[in-house]
């Protein structure tokens, strides 16, 4: 089905805006995935703050041409599903990775983060990034552990001096 020129321009503009706002992008081939499964994926994506769209490759290349995601141009072949993470860099990668576990025909092609190309086998790097809240809690536990150790050391020194004075 042919798309009118105005519609093509609108699609390119919409995807370009999503790309400029996105923190990372993940590209997949969803050929053979059922409509119901794709609807579920889109619902999960909305909840996770991820923009998901199936776009023609030529339009996608134009949309990401002036963004950090232009490194993905070589993987824009065949049916292309692209996802941009808007709130957390690893959100789209986590979403696609989880979805791929239940779908044999769903294939993650590649990802891009901060202008760097990540092959399909490197998606775990992006998917395992902690969220902001997780990173803060990890940092706080490290600080709390160091503080507790310092307090115990000072208490032991104090007890040692008291024992020596007595």
Curated annotation (Swiss-Prot):
This protein's UniProt keywords: Ribonucleoprotein, Ribosomal protein, RNA-binding, rRNA-binding
SUPFAM superfamilies to which the protein is assigned, alphabetical: Ribosomal protein L10-like (SSF160369)
Keyword Ribonucleoprotein (UniProt): yes
A Gene Ontology cellular-component term: large ribosomal subunit
InterPro entries the UniProt entry points to: Ribosomal_uL10, Ribosomal_uL10-like_sf, Ribosomal_uL10_bac, Ribosomal_uL10_bac_type, Ribosomal_uL10_CS_bac
GO biological process: one example: translation
Disulfide bonds: none
Top-level lineage group: Bacteria
GO molecular function (one): large ribosomal subunit rRNA binding
CDD domains from the UniProt entry: Ribosomal_L10
Assembly and interaction partners: Part of the ribosomal stalk of the 50S ribosomal subunit. The N-terminus interacts with L11 and the large rRNA to form the base of the stalk. The C-terminus forms an elongated spine to which L12 dimers bind in a sequential fashion forming a multimeric L10(L12)X complex.
Family statement: Belongs to the universal ribosomal protein uL10 family.
Protein function: Forms part of the ribosomal stalk, playing a central role in the interaction of the ribosome with GTP-bound translation factors.
Protein name according to UniProt: Large ribosomal subunit protein uL10
Organism of origin: Pseudomonas syringae pv. tomato (strain ATCC BAA-871 / DC3000)
Originating gene: rplJ
């Amino acid at each position: 089905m042919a798309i009118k020129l105005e519609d093509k321009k609108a699609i390119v503009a919409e995807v370009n805006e999503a790309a400029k706002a996105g923190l990372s992008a993940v590209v997949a081939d969803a050929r053979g995935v059922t409509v119901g499964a794709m609807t579920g994926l889109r619902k999960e994506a909305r909840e996770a703050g991820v923009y998901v769209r199936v776009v023609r490759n030529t339009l996608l290349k134009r949309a990401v041409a002036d963004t950090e995601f232009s490194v993905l141009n070589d993987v824009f072949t065949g049916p292309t599903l692209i996802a941009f993470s808007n709130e957390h860099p690893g959100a789209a990668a986590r979403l696609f990775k989880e979805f791929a576990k239940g779908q044999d025909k769903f294939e993650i092609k590649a990802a891009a983060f901060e202008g760097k190309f990540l092959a399909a086998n490197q998606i775990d790097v992006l998917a395992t990034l902690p969220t902001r809240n997780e990173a803060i809690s990890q940092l706080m536990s490290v600080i709390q552990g160091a503080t507790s150790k310092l307090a115990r050391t000072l208490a032991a020194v104090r007890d040692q001096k008291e024992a020596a004075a007595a």
